Amino acid sequence: LPIWMKLNRRVTIITRFSGIMFSLLLLGGLAACSDDNNGNDTPEPEPSTYPTTPFSKIELKEVIESDAQPVTATHTYLYNSAGRLTSYTGKQSFTAGDELFEIENTTTVEYKDHQAVITDEAGTVSTYTLNDKGYATTCTSQDMAGNTRTYTFSYLINTEDKYYLENITEKLDDGKEYSFITIDYSNFRALRIQQKVDTFEHNSTATTPSGNEIANISEIPSLFITDMYPLSMHAVAIYGKILGEPANYLITQLIPDSNGESEETTTYTYTLDNR
């Protein structure tokens, strides 16, 4: 069976670094005519060749240790029966005294003709223009105050006609370029990443061990991607494959160049089940 037809597939991935623990739960069980977890079904957008995800739910838990009390952040992405992202819910939980506090917000995703519209609870609307393959070429994001940012995207296209994000460029209201990220895929074991925000520049290398690569059969985005500005503004689009496919192998280290402010190397370890 193709991967999207395999039922009850589960993968748990855990990584610990810098006092933060991530736990990622991916739930399979997609079938072409089934409803999502809430009993609702969103029609598959046209054309049917748009990229899809082989899961009905991705849940990422992040435990952040602090001097006060630990905060648990839960990120939940829900997909319809066609494998298209329909919503994201972010929740922060912490205990103060004997009382549990929770802060929750929801972001919705709607699909139109060659468009994906992502709206968060703060009223920010991001409209992505999609090419014929379903990948975004541009995005216009406007917040409640009327501030507008525009983004352009370019991709590396492999021999299987899959798109991998190569560049994102952000411009402000006045048309000035404010930030960008460029990813070089020349060596799939060592992705070179160039990042610039305003006048700050930072380069790093995302690596996977030579000869001992971990295949990304679950098709999950690299965890570090959504921590990098301006890609951090597009986490929902990344998990919806609106900004291309995830890397073919799981990244195990993110190593900054010596020209950056941070010299800290981030290490990722993974535990996977056998299903």
Each predicted region: which residue ranges?
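N-terminal secretory signal peptides that target proteins for export/translocation
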Residues: L1-T15
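Generic hydrophobic-segment detector
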Residues: R9, S18-G19, T124, P230
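Sec-dependent N-terminal signal peptides
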Residues: I13-S23
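C-terminal motif of bacterial Sec signal peptides marking the signal peptidase cleavage site
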Residues: G28-A32
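Buried hydrophobic residues that stabilize the cores of well-folded domains
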Residues: D36-R275
